[in-house]
Amino acid sequence: MDKTMTLFLLLSTLLLTTSLAKDLCHKDDKTTLLKIKKSLNNPYHLASWDPKTDCCSWYCLECGDATVNHRVTSLIIQDGEISGQIPPEVGDLPYLTSLIFRKLTNLTGHIQPTIAKLKNLTFLRLSWTNLTGPVPEFLSQLKNLEYIDLSFNDLSGSIPSSLSSLRKLEYLELSRNKLTGPIPESFGTFSGKVPSLFLSHNQLSGTIPKSLGNPDFYRIDLSRNKLQGDASILFGAKKTTWIVDISRNMFQFDLSKVKLAKTLNNLDMNHNGITGSIPAEWSKAYFQLLNVSYNRLCGRIPKGEYIQRFDSYSFFHNKCLCGAPLPSCK
């Protein structure tokens, strides 16, 4: 009798555990995910999304723990043969903290406005697709955003100044689009943290705002635009900047007066209209990358352990720079 009872209890526990395991997925999330799959034309990439199975076991997503009732917290669709537009149903996954559509060259249309409903979102990556239209203003409504990557798309129009109001933002990547207009003045007064800022390979124009000299950017890349003005405001001895890339613009300033942060590791300012000479203090800088070519610099290249690592490519096509690795000064 005891053995029978023990066996009964074990079987009951097993059945209960199996039942609970099957029911981890919230029914509303499963319904929404199946609508997303249908909206994307039922791609093979989402073959695991079988309505007969627990959605928390499906590929391309993650569920949270019991504290959020195992709701879907991450949707990660990338590297697949998927066509269409971002399904509006993504906005019906209220517990999402991470949303990624990446390396989907047949994904088209505008950035889905229903994303504005995702108030818990901290990580947004919509990159390497064929998305068009503007960088949406509604992103500034998502107050928990820490990471935004909209690079390698066909986005156009101006950069919304309201993005600077995101107090938790640490990373803003808008490179490789068709964005136009100036850098917003408000980017000199981010409400919270100062994010790493990547705006390269666009069609941005106008004078760089003076306010951009106020933040202590850890990484800033403004390369390959049509920007003008005095970019020396980005530098400063008291800053903690690591990477600055302002190459292939139309910046004009006197390099002789520029003081570098001791932390600066990568500096690229090739193809501008920069004048003056390379400061002697640069001989002590710890550069891993340096390029000042195609400017209007003159004078002797300072001698130093790290600056001497670079070949002529980093210095050539200037007005009258001289000294190793270029020809000797006369």
Curated annotation (Swiss-Prot):
Annotated glycan sites: N106, N120, N130, N291
Gene Ontology molecular function: any one: polygalacturonase inhibitor activity
Main location as per UniProt: secreted
Subcellular location: Secreted, Cell wall; Membrane
Listed Pfam families: LRR_1, LRR_8, LRRNT_2
Record's keyword annotation contains Chloroplast: no
Gene: PGIP2
Endpoints of the signal sequence: 1-21
Protein name: Polygalacturonase inhibitor 2
Membrane topology, as annotated: Peripheral membrane protein
Disulfide feature: C25-C55, C56-C63, C298-C320, C322-C329
Function as written in the Swiss-Prot or TrEMBL entry: Inhibitor of fungal polygalacturonase. It is an important factor for plant resistance to phytopathogenic fungi.
InterPro entries in the record: Leu-rich_rpt, LRR_dom_sf, LRR_N_plant-typ, PGIP
